[in-house]
Amino acid sequence: MLKTTQKSLLIFIVVFSLIFGTDQAIKYAILEGFRYESLIIDIVLVFNKGVAFSLLSFLEGGLKYLQILLILGLFIFLMCQKELFKNHAIEFGMVFGAGVSNVLDRFVHGGVVDYVYYHYGFDFAIFNFADVMIDVGVGVLLLRQFFFKQKQNKIKA
């Protein structure tokens, strides 16, 4: 029988691998020429040299090293916060799998491979599957941490 920490680590690794693999597979298709155009969403190829909305693009090649330090620092922190990691292994697997996939793009392609362009009614930033998974992972983590944790505390009281 796996200990809780080992089980959480296994869940983290599985989710990390699924998100990372899915994101890289989609990006491979985009890099091989897959395109789509519609009135609402286009699939186009863009190399994002910055982070969200191309922020910090002035850091150029140094950004990928800064991101590696941030990812490693956060992972070390989580390994020290076993309860937090145990309770949110799925969300952290999503965020780390997506984040590492985007950092890999910086090393391999010189920028993050972005491709989803939403333009119905207004122009929105071009993004990718990994960006969505980071948003979903953080969103679920916040919901569970603030809303569901409060319900648990009320039950105990």
Swiss-Prot record:
GO MF terms, alphabetically ordered: aspartic-type endopeptidase activity
Active-site residues (renumbered): 114, 131
GO CC annotations, alphabetized: plasma membrane
GO biological process terms on file: proteolysis
Membrane topology type: Multi-pass membrane protein
Residues that span the membrane, as ranges: 10-30, 58-78, 84-104, 122-142
Keyword entries, A-Z: Aspartyl protease, Cell inner membrane, Cell membrane, Hydrolase, Membrane, Protease, Transmembrane, Transmembrane helix
InterPro entries: Peptidase_A8 (IPR001872)
EC number: 3.4.23.36
Cell compartments where the protein resides: Cell inner membrane
Pfam family, one: Peptidase_A8
Pathway membership: Protein modification; lipoprotein biosynthesis (signal peptide cleavage)
Enzymatic reactions: Release of signal peptides from bacterial membrane prolipoproteins. Hydrolyzes -Xaa-Yaa-Zaa-|-(S,diacylglyceryl)Cys-, in which Xaa is hydrophobic (preferably Leu), and Yaa (Ala or Ser) and Zaa (Gly or Ala) have small, neutral side chains
Family per similarity comment: Belongs to the peptidase A8 family.
Functional summary from the UniProt entry: This protein specifically catalyzes the removal of signal peptides from prolipoproteins.
NCBIfam families with a match to the protein in the record: lspA
The protein, known as: Lipoprotein signal peptidase
Origin species: Helicobacter pylori (strain Shi470)
